[in-house]
C-alpha cells in the first residue's frame, strides 16, 4: 500500500492548533528550534 508520511505528527492535529493562538507562538519557536 502507498502511505505518504511527510511528517511524524498527524496533520489533522496541526489544523486544530492553527486555529489556536498558542499555535502562532509555537510556530515561531519551532522555526528557531529547527
From Swiss-Prot:
Q: Report the GO molecular function annotations.
A: DNA binding
UniProt keywords (A-Z) are: Chromosome, Developmental protein, Differentiation, DNA condensation, DNA-binding, Nucleosome core, Nucleus, Spermatogenesis
Q: Where in the cell is it found?
A: Nucleus; Chromosome
Its recorded name reads Protamine-Z1/Z2
Q: Where is this region: Disordered?
A: 1-34
Specify the superkingdom: Eukaryota
The role this protein plays is: Protamines substitute for histones in the chromatin of sperm during the haploid phase of spermatogenesis. They compact sperm DNA into a highly condensed, stable and inactive complex.
Gene Ontology biological-process annotations? cell differentiation; chromosome condensation; spermatogenesis
Species of the source: Sarda orientalis (Striped bonito)
Q: Species lineage, top-down?
A: Eukaryota, Metazoa, Chordata, Craniata, Vertebrata
Disulfide-linked positions = none
Q: Please provide, in alphabetical order, the Gene Ontology terms of the cellular component aspect for this entry.
A: nucleosome; nucleus
Kindly indicate whether the keyword Cell wall biogenesis/degradation belongs to this entry: no
Beyond the main fields, what else does the record say? Answer: The sardaine Z1 sequence is shown.
Q: Impact of mutating residue 7 to A?
A: In protamine-Z2
User: Which tissues is it found in, per the record?
Assistant: Testis.
For the keyword Nucleus, the answer is yes
Amino acid at each position: 500500500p502507498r502511505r505518504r508520511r511527510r511528517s511524524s505528527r498527524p496533520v489533522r492535529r496541526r489544523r486544530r492548533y492553527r486555529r489556536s493562538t498558542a499555535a502562532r507562538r509555537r510556530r515561531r519557536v519551532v522555526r528557531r528550534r529547527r
